[in-house]
Amino acid sequence: MKAPIPHLILLYATFTQSLKVVTKRGSADGCTDWSVDIKKYQVLVGEPVRIKCALFYGYIRTNYSLAQSAGLSLMWYKSSGPGDFEEPIAFDGSRMSKEEDSIWFRPTLLQDSGLYACVIRNSTYCMKVSISLTVGENDTGLCYNSKMKYFEKAELSKSKEISCRDIEDFLLPTREPEILWYKECRTKAWRPSIVFKRDTLLIKEVKEDDIGNYTCELKYGGFVVRRTTELTVTAPLTDKPPKLLYPMESKLTVQETQLGGSANLTCRAFFGYSGDVSPLIYWMKGEKFIEDLDENRVWESDIRILKEHLGEQEVSISLIVDSVEEGDLGNYSCYVENGNGRRHASVLLHKRELMYTVELAGGLGAILLLLICSVTIYKCYKIEIMLFYRNHFGAEELDGDNKDYDAYLSYTKVDPDQWNQETGEEERFALEILPDMLEKHYGYKLFIPDRDLIPTGNIEDVARCVDQSKRLIIVMTPNYVVRRGWSIFELETRLRNMLVTGEIKVILIECSELRGIMNYQEVEALKHTIKLLTVIKWHGPKCNKLNSKFWKRLQYEMPFKRIEPITHEQALDVSEQGPFGELQTVSAISMAAATSTALATAHPDLRSTFHNTYHSQMRQKHYYRSYEYDVPPTGTLPLTSIGNQHTYCNIPMTLINGQRPQTKSNREPNPDEAHTNSAILPLLPRETSISSVIW
């Protein structure tokens, strides 16, 4: 049965006058297009959803039944986006179906995302609107999609109700829904102050740890519907104006600056929670805002949030004055305000007077600090600094140019087979490492008595050798102290005077802890006797390293001279002089005369016997190399055989002077005692002719 004509006219009039006033995108083909509706559908893949035609829910004051009675038909189209081609939807009646003014998806698929346009029209009238549908997947490891959440805020200590949103289409009027709640996708033992009512979760007293994501889960048929709401907890809404932290309201703050320099005035304030209202903080000079000043040199920085907690903020803003002039001086005020009031505080920008006293004190303080630093550096690195200066700018030591040696080395000689575990390192250092480093590495010329002194030389010869040296090095090993190796310097008057008057500089090397050793008190007395004395500690094998403090200190105390270090090839000549360098030679004529005299007095049978016996014994006892010389059968040594050689023998000085020893004619020569008679000893190498172990 058709409706009466007056009734249809009234329906059309009501329909056309009840249109929602919104911005229309335009009209095409006589159809009014309301573009995309503000309501957007967002659903997880696999969940059901109902899309309603928005024309019946806000654009016109009618429903689907009245429109259909008025002869209007409803059609659905789908497009990928605004302006794209729209194609009619073919409903299959199962997964996607048209039911009155809606489309049902049971369930949704990813390809269902897009714009769905509903159009109502007849032959004379047309209107359409598009509805957006987004189908997404859960985030990895979560039960929700972070882009499809609802957002709620709650104030601390107040109550908050969280609803399970947009589930009206899945509720039955005759049945209570069964809804499960999760926090961060996990079941939770809810505290008693949290209550569940139908489709809501009620928190009676909000706490800070209530912040998080709440997910409600509802079963609809064979499907699951989930909605997630993120709850943010804030401080209670403030009813007070902001609080100025700096400058303070109660007093005027003075900030000094120099003309021509830059000035920075910083204002800090605390803002309570005021909802979504941003903090308002700014500077003024007098009654003018900073941006209203004519000077471009004066400007405000951006507002910076220093701290934020539960919506409460501590913020700051700076006023910068570039190249301060007289006109920039004056009073500046910082204002802060919110809906509850306004506060301000002032800063007086003042010209700084030059304070010459302070500047002078600062300059003197800087000089004093520099002086202290320089003295400290010099104290710590004095030796390194002096060595650097000597090596690059120093001149050779002129005092003592007429002396032949850089140093006289005094030590106690102990055979290696007598070294023990406690003193072995000290003896090796004194006999091998010390002379080898000084001569071969640093290039010094040493007088080593064991090497350079005529074996039977007397104490006057030692004094002359010390006098020809620029330094006296005494190596204080435990054996040296026990044997009182310094006695020679006390017995000879000339040597003692040299030490007391400071004619020679003494370097005393202590190789170990000497306290408690016999004769140690005499060592201390000796130190007080020597006028020019330097004591250097040798602390064991770690001091043997070339870059150690020990070698730097010793090089500093030695005379400075520009000498190329002696190489191993330079230290040895054709006569194989030994490990410590050039040897002193004895006059060839005197040695020949002495040898002839000595051998002439010896029994012929003892010559070869003693020669072999003495050499074999001394080779076993001494650690230096030994050298053999063949004695001519005539008992005299040709002059050419000892020329250009360093030949040594254990011959008394009386024989070198041409004297002949007195012997008893009635005494038979004893071969076993032949080695004790120095008058008949043959020519021996210098290693086996040492008559003393202390030099």
Curated annotation (Swiss-Prot):
Extracellular face of the membrane: 25-357
Annotated stretches, region: Disordered: 657-679
Tree of life domain: Eukaryota
Residues in the Cytoplasmic compartment per record: 379-695
InterPro entries, per database record: Ig-like_dom, Ig-like_dom_sf, Ig-like_fold, Ig_sub, Ig_sub2, IL-1_rcpt_fam, IL-1RAcP-like_ig, Immunoglobulin_dom
Signal sequence region: 1-24
Membrane topology: Single-pass type I membrane protein
TM region positions: 358-378
Glycan attachment sites: N63, N122, N138, N213, N264, N331
Function in brief: May regulate secretion and presynaptic differentiation through inhibition of the activity of N-type voltage-gated calcium channel. May activate the MAP kinase JNK. Plays a role in neurite outgrowth. During dendritic spine formation can bidirectionally induce pre- and post-synaptic differentiation of neurons by trans-synaptically binding to PTPRD.
Subunit structure: Homodimer. Interacts (calcium-independent) with NCS1/FREQ. Interacts (via the first immunoglobilin domain) with PTPRD (via the second immunoglobilin domain); this interaction is PTPRD-splicing-dependent and induces pre- and post-synaptic differentiation of neurons and is required for IL1RAPL1-mediated synapse formation.
Protein name as catalogued: Interleukin-1 receptor accessory protein-like 1
Organism: Mus musculus
UniProt gene name: Il1rapl1
